[in-house]
């Protein structure tokens, strides 16, 4: 799938589903589930690298894990889920030339067909515009932006009028720049609904209500494997408890055998 194909999903009122992945096994599970998008998110910092936030993740980490994810795909590159890679902290806030270089490394050295970038500050918009002109598709990300948690925290965004209106303006700006879709994270449902109505490109929600054109979830959260479960993601199984008990049973049985 190509990024440009997602617009057809919105026109046809076809829900877009995205899952995160971080290695070959999770990539295989995400792709075989039928997800339209497999996102190698910088959330892998917490999911598999043991960090407390996304900030320590490097460009090399993202390239390494994106390649691992793609090796789990069963279909040909032209047919499999759209593979998107997060640009980690300080790889696109460091000037246009460096951002193009780093995004280019992701696209050239992995099977990712797009990058995701958080925020819409003027400097970030300049970078997004440049990347798109250079032929690199960009997925936007507004609302709660984890890379900005030192300034904004991890709380719900858009609750005050000023923030509410800014997120709406930023969404329109990102569409105008050429983003093929926008992730809306942890914002009021009404705000997400208004943005979805205003935009021609699809919105993909996570903790943003039911009116987005699609939904994305961190796979580890869905499977109940995360240490801290976000309030907007109900696990489909208590994976940590289930697999923990099964492993204990096996260890016990092996010791007694």
Swiss-Prot record:
The record's remark on the cofactor is: Binds 1 Mg(2+) ion per subunit.
Q: Which reaction does it catalyse?
A: 3-methyl-2-oxobutanoate + (6R)-5,10-methylene-5,6,7,8-tetrahydrofolate + H2O = 2-dehydropantoate + (6S)-5,6,7,8-tetrahydrofolate
Entry's family note: Belongs to the PanB family.
Query: Can you tell me which residues bind 3-methyl-2-oxobutanoate?
Result: 42-43, 86, 116
Q: Which domain of life is it from?
A: Bacteria
- Asked whether the UniProt record includes Oxidoreductase among its keywords, one would answer no
Which InterPro entries has this protein been placed in?
A: Pantoate_hydroxy_MeTrfase, Pyrv/PenolPyrv_kinase-like_dom, Pyrv_kinase-like_dom_sf
Protein name from the UniProt record: 3-methyl-2-oxobutanoate hydroxymethyltransferase
Residues where Mg(2+) binds? 42, 86, 118
SUPFAM superfamilies with a match to the protein in the record: Phosphoenolpyruvate/pyruvate domain
